[in-house]
Amino acid sequence: QAFDGVIISHWSDTLSYTSALVSFLFRHTPVPVMLTAADRPLADVKSNGLENFKAAVDFITNAGLKGVFVSYRDKQGKQAIYLASRLCQADAYLDVFTPFGGAPFGYMEHGAFIPNISPCNPKPEELRADQKPVFTQPPVFITPVLMVQPYPNMQYDLFPVQNTKVVLLYLYHSATACTQGEEATSVLPFIERCRRQKTAVYGASFKRRQASGLYATEHALLQAGVAPLFNISPEAAYTKLCIAYNQNETET
């Protein structure tokens, strides 16, 4: 191989979406792929862009791991390394990112990678295993995915589904949404409209797979035909559906 790693310098606003996409499509790369961004323009002396880029270089040089990662300073000022598939959108006030599950993969300290031991994280040696490419042909993205995030008094009848193939309901943290009350503000008539239009509906993020531990609202969603996605961020769920509903290639 002619290089030790790849660095993608990215606009911060959509970094979490691109990170998820690159993570799913390039899991097989034999060298680390690093994404990074800055909280301010690089000409601003307060920008963290240079530190984030340097940490990406140090990780490639010293960590001895392959996979897709994000280098970005956290709110404590530590140089965090995130699994790219778990990065969540930056806070609108502090401009800092957080990982789904709350645990960064590790930190860069004086040029060395320090793993963050957590039940949420894979062990570093797990990332050294070889992975098969997801696709042999370049992916295509033509069919859009409609992502709906419920909030109180949401008017579901405002969402047209006639030309929509797939909907992602990114639910409240308990995997719930309003299932009672007026037809316009209950998610169940919306799901029924999707069913009649042959529109697939996915819900995230579910925690429990055992029916005995579900809330009544979770039961109602599943009984209405929602396909559950478990323990997944909005960005990762959206990106996976974009990939799944746009490719013709299947694994052999």
Briefly describe each language-model feature range:
Residues 1-252:
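Active-site histidine-anchored catalytic micro-motif
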